[in-house]
Amino acid sequence: MSETILLILALALVIDRVVGDPDWLWARVPHPVVFFGKAIGFFDARLNREDLEDSARKFRGVVAILLLLGISAWFGHLLHRLFAVLGPLGFLLEAVLVAVFLAQKSLADHVRRVAGGLRQGGLEGGRAAVSMIVGRDPKTLDEPAVCRAAIESLAENFSDGVVAPAFWYAVAGLPGLLAYKMLNTADSMIGHKSPKYLHFGWASARLDDLANLPAARLSILLISAGALIHRGASAAKDALTVALRDHGLHRSPNSGWPEAAMAGALDLQLAGPRIYGGVKVSEPMINGPGRAVATSEDIDAGIAVFYGACTVMAGFVLAIAMI
């Protein structure tokens, strides 16, 4: 965790906050995650054969993800060495690359569209917007459920789309960042429990849980800080209290932390029963004593807390770099 790495990260956080993921750019050139997906698909097509025993598919999945992580870390090392010889230009280029793998503005923009969709197009407008950021069946969602889904996505993706990549870059530079993004992409592609990926994707899912563990815990402190800025000391305290009390109510070992913190910050019930692909997932409500009916104004409040948390993180990174 060198001074240079932290300064690059601070600049990257500013770039991502201001620029985000411009559609005009990624409409012309492929996003780096596209290449991660192609690499994962290559190994999936060649190693994940249906005629193999479950144990063989699990072993091949372990080999595949270890190779993918090694390749991505090696490529990150090469890029860092290249940027290092370019002086100030390399410093800027590395910051831009790091910003590409952060999701502050793009996440807030997507979630804000849900509130806008509800206000401009009613329930159908909200359902259409939220379907772009969550996997649950939008037709089963009423307006409060649409709002809850948007806020849950905001909280969860703050952890694995902002805090986690920033954490792994701070700890291990470009090799750590690229390896994390490869792992995160693999988890989304092959880490689910469908018959095809239950065994082949086992290692990717477990490693992703492990890699996101530090960020999930850090995220509750940042969300609490964001709540302090925008909603006061009581909301900040509730964010921590609910996170520590209710994180285990979520089926994910990591997502429950930021979601519970956001639920406490907004005095709102989150999670609970929902439907994915026609299958009902029965879970208790996080922050049961909180308000039961979420509104588009709660989405706005969640975004304010989110941006407050991002600001605190950027300030903390810069402060550590300057010590």
Curated annotation (Swiss-Prot):
Subcellular location: Cell membrane
Matching HAMAP family: CobD_CbiB (MF_00024)
Protein known as: Cobalamin biosynthesis protein CobD
Gene Ontology cellular-component annotations: plasma membrane
Function recorded in the entry: Converts cobyric acid to cobinamide by the addition of aminopropanol on the F carboxylic group.
Coiled-coil stretches noted in the UniProt entry, renumbered to this chain: none
Record's keyword terms, sorted: Cell membrane, Cobalamin biosynthesis, Membrane, Porphyrin biosynthesis, Transmembrane, Transmembrane helix
Organism: Sinorhizobium sp
Topology within the bilayer: Multi-pass membrane protein
Swiss-Prot/TrEMBL GO biological process terms: cobalamin biosynthetic process; porphyrin-containing compound biosynthetic process
Pathway: Cofactor biosynthesis; adenosylcobalamin biosynthesis
